[in-house]
Amino acid sequence: IGIRNLDSDAYKVIKITFPPLPEQQRIVGILDEAFDGIATAKANAEKNLQNARALFESHLQSVFTQRGKGWERVRIEDTCESIMDCVNKTAPKVDRPTSFKMIRTTNVRNGRVNLDSVNYVTENVYRIWTRRQIPQRGDVILTREAPMGEVGMLLSDDKVFLGQRLVSYRANPARLNKRFLLYALQSGDLQGQIRALASGSTVQHMRVPDSKNLQLPVPSLREQEETVATLDSLRKETQRLASLYQRKLAALEALKKSLLHRAFNGEL
C-alpha cells in the first residue's frame, strides 16, 4: 500500500483561524511566561526526584561499606538453605494464560519480581521445570545475564518457575535475614563482585558456580534485622517522595497541555 502522505499543494489551501497580531502577541506572552514557570517547576521536581532516590542509594551503600564490629565475610552458599539455577533449556510456552508462570530476566527489577507480564506453560511443563525445587515467597532471584545483576524478591504464592539465566537464593533463617540478603545483593559491594566474575566478550554473564561463591558481608541476625528495618523505612519514604514528585511532573505536563488548548480556543 505504501506510506500515506498529504500532497504539498493541499497544505496551501488549509484554512486556519487566528486573532489579530496584538492578540497573538498577548497570548504568546502569557504562554511564554507560563511555560517558563512550568519548566522551572519541572526541573525542580526532577531534581527532587533524583535526590530522593539518591538518598536511599547512598544509605544502602554506606551500610555495606562502613561495616561495624562483628561483621564477617562468608560464602553466600554457607548462609542459604539452597541456591537453585534454572533448567538449562527454554521451557515450551503456551499462548493462553494458565496457572503456571515462567519468571524471565525482564521480570526481575529494582528489588521486585513483577509477574504482570510473564510467559505461561502447561502443568506438565511446570512440574518438569520445578522437579528440583519449587520457588516460594521470600526467595531472592538474581539475573545472571541480559542484564546481569538485577535482583528481586518473590512476594507471590503463584505457581512460578525460573526461566533461563536466573538463579534463586533461599536464605537460611538461622543465619540470614532474607531482606538483608536482598539489600546486600543490591549493594555496590556485591554488584562489584558480580561484575568482576562476569565472562563473555559480547554478552556479559555470571556462571552458576560463581553465583554460589559470592562473599557476603554479614553481622549478627539482630543487627541484620535492625539494618533491614532502617532500610525498609527509608525505602518506603523514598518511594512516597518519588510518587509525589512523579505526580507533580504529570500535573505540570497536563497544565501545559491545558494552557495550549485554552490558548487556541480563545480562552486566555
Whereabouts are the PLM-identified features?
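Short loop segments at secondary-structure junctions
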Residues: 171-174, 188-189
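Non-catalytic DNA-recognition/assembly elements of restriction-modification systems
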Residues: 13-29, 33-36, 40-87, 213, ...
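Low-complexity, Lys/Gly-biased intrinsically disordered segments
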Residues: 72-113, 128-130
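Acidic, low-complexity, intrinsically disordered peripheral segments
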Residues: 259-268
